[in-house]
Amino acid sequence: MLKEVRPAVVSLLALTMITGLAYPLAVTGLATVLFPYQAQGSLVERGGKVVGSALIGQEFKGDEYFHGRPSATVAPDPADSSKTVSAPYNAANSGGSNLGPTSKALADRLSEDVAKLKAENPAAPIPVDLVTTSGSGLDPDISPEGALFQVPRVAKARGVTEEQIRKLVGASIEQPLGGVLGESRVNVLKLNLALDAAAPR
């Protein structure tokens, strides 16, 4: 009996060591050597202090900042653990709203967002990414059009010219990888940090 069981036990232990220990350590070690910034979570620092990650969006409020996409993430309701409450950019509970096109809640939210954006910049068409959530609810980027749409509000709140803010947006645009993969985008956290440095409140 021991003779028959021994190969299975040895195989189990060997594969556990290879796939559960050696392989993850090797991949982590290589990533840390070859891509140290990404391996540590693409953390963004300011004045030696971590203020966020380039890969995870965060909520910015106030007219003086650029805003990201709407986030549909939720968190447990402190008053009733069987329910949830809205918690934008909750990285512990990534996901979309799963609301369909016939959902009244989705239609109401879209109408409210569109009305707010039209009041902010009546003459410009509203970029779709400013009213739609991403699949993860944690998207750190917006389109260049989404950033440019917000320029008048930000410039007015900061007391600077729109041209100054447009130049900042232009300098913050990240191109598709290799010119073909993905779309042009603006990282909201990095743009707001550049904004604070160039035009302090």
From Swiss-Prot:
Membrane topology category: Single-pass membrane protein
Subcellular location: Cell inner membrane
InterPro entries per the UniProt record, alphabetical: KdpC
Tagged with keyword Protein biosynthesis: no
Membrane as UniProt keyword: yes
Keywords of this entry: ATP-binding, Cell inner membrane, Cell membrane, Ion transport, Membrane, Nucleotide-binding, Potassium, Potassium transport, Transmembrane, Transmembrane helix, Transport
One Pfam family, short name: KdpC
Residues covered by region (Disordered): 69-102
A GO molecular-function descriptor: ATP binding
Subunit comment: The system is composed of three essential subunits: KdpA, KdpB and KdpC.
Function of the molecule: Part of the high-affinity ATP-driven potassium transport (or Kdp) system, which catalyzes the hydrolysis of ATP coupled with the electrogenic transport of potassium into the cytoplasm. This subunit acts as a catalytic chaperone that increases the ATP-binding affinity of the ATP-hydrolyzing subunit KdpB by the formation of a transient KdpB/KdpC/ATP ternary complex.
Family to which this protein belongs: Belongs to the KdpC family.
Full protein name: Potassium-transporting ATPase KdpC subunit
Organism from which the protein derives: Rhodopseudomonas palustris (strain TIE-1)
